[in-house]
Amino acid sequence: MAKRDYYEVLGVNKSASKDEIKKAYRKLSKKYHPDINKEEGADEKFKEISEAYEVLSDENKRVNYDQFGHDGPQGGFGSQGFGGSDFGGFEDIFSSFFGGGSRQRDPNAPRKGDDLQYTMTITFEEAVFGTKKEISIKKDVTCHTCNGDGAKPGTSKKTCSYCNGAGRVSVEQNTILGRVRTEQVCPKCEGSGQEFEEPCPTCKGKGTENKTVKLEVTVPEGVDNEQQVRLAGEGSPGVNGGPHGDLYVVFRVKPSNTFERDGDDIYYNLDISFSQAALGDEIKIPTLKSNVVLTIPAGTQTGKQFRLKDKGVKNVHGYGYGDLFVNIKVVTPTKLNDRQKELLKEFAEINGENINEQSSNFKDRAKRFFKGE
């Protein structure tokens, strides 16, 4: 008997998308699955649907099928056309019905403990020069009474009464395919197959207790905001003898009142007067470690930037130092006495400038307005 067209089997047209093909397969597989449909021929119908989906859900197989039909270049797409390992497509769909695949993690295998995170706020100076700080952190530690075993000292473990030592239990679930029996990890022993004769009175069988622990943290010289250090083995205790997790300390750096930081470089804003800008000057400015004298050349303008090499922050990885950049702003005086005004007017005249003096004082400006000046 000739095979039906795969598109016809699934009830879709040849231009159907992957999602449309998958949707059609889901609908038909629910209807004809042998565990649900007991009618004669349902089993063969389900196999036909599965075979059609296996081909049309695979791009390469679909291209070959569209070109050659059932008599493809590799001997067709029948039951001989693909092996058991190629059924991943619809096995993935049914995994949601039957509770997962066959691979199960050994519940008794050693597992590393969870990593923890702690946020530490430090000053700009502490970040630049480094320091040591003590922190207090609340975390799970190995129970001091049972040493992590979970059992009361002097007692032992016994076979789990719920799963009889299997570590897994069989349960029935209502699914879209009807009632399906699946295996799950035992909820009582969590897969170990054992339970306590008497749990530890301190940790109630958990093997851990929550305590506040003090730790010393080394703040590296040159650390920046949002960077972190790892304290190996200071995380949560491992499971089944596994190693402890790690503690990651994340730094939050407070801004400086003097400098702005960008990586290893720092910036300092320097205001200078009109006279200093015009004539030049030598000005003492701060750096990270001491004051230095900065030479301001005559004619310096607002926006001029001076670079002081290696006066920035030490690179946290040891790759030298950043630079200090000094940004210049020429400040215009807002209050002038008569003598200063006289000198500036004289300066303007020498430059051939005709200055129409304006007052910054509201009363003076009002008087000039009403006088028509």
Curated annotation (Swiss-Prot):
Entry note: cofactor: Binds 2 Zn(2+) ions per monomer.
Cofactor: Zn(2+)
CXXCXGXG motif repeat residue intervals: 143-150, 160-167, 186-193, 200-207
Keyword Transport annotated: no
SUPFAM superfamilies associated with the record: Chaperone J-domain, DnaJ/Hsp40 cysteine-rich domain, HSP40/DnaJ peptide-binding domain
Subcellular location: Cytoplasm
The J domain, residue ranges: 5-69
Annotated binding of Zn(2+) 1, by residue: 143, 146, 200, 203
Taxonomic superkingdom: Bacteria
InterPro entries with a match to the protein in the record: DnaJ, DnaJ_C, DnaJ_domain, DnaJ_domain_CS, HSP40/DnaJ_pept-bd, HSP_DnaJ_Cys-rich_dom, HSP_DnaJ_Cys-rich_dom_sf, J_dom_sf
Alphabetical keyword list: Chaperone, Cytoplasm, DNA replication, Metal-binding, Repeat, Stress response, Zinc, Zinc-finger
Gene3D superfamilies the UniProt entry points to: DnaJ domain (1.10.287.110), Heat shock protein DnaJ, cysteine-rich domain (2.10.230.10), Urease metallochaperone UreE, N-terminal domain (2.60.260.20)
Zinc finger (CR-type): 130-212
Pfam families: DnaJ (PF00226), DnaJ_C (PF01556), DnaJ_CXXCXGXG (PF00684)
Gene Ontology CC terms, in alphabetical order: cytoplasm
Transmembrane feature ranges: none
GO BP, sorted A to Z: chaperone cofactor-dependent protein refolding; DNA replication; protein refolding; response to heat
CDD domains reported in the protein's UniProt record: DnaJ, DnaJ_C, DnaJ_zf
Family, similarity comment: Belongs to the DnaJ family.
Domain comment in the entry: The J domain is necessary and sufficient to stimulate DnaK ATPase activity. Zinc center 1 plays an important role in the autonomous, DnaK-independent chaperone activity of DnaJ. Zinc center 2 is essential for interaction with DnaK and for DnaJ activity.
Listed name of the protein: Chaperone protein DnaJ
Species the sequence originates in: Staphylococcus epidermidis (strain ATCC 35984 / DSM 28319 / BCRC 17069 / CCUG 31568 / BM 3577 / RP62A)
Lineage of the species this protein comes from: Bacteria, Bacillati, Bacillota, Bacilli, Bacillales
Gene designation per UniProt: dnaJ
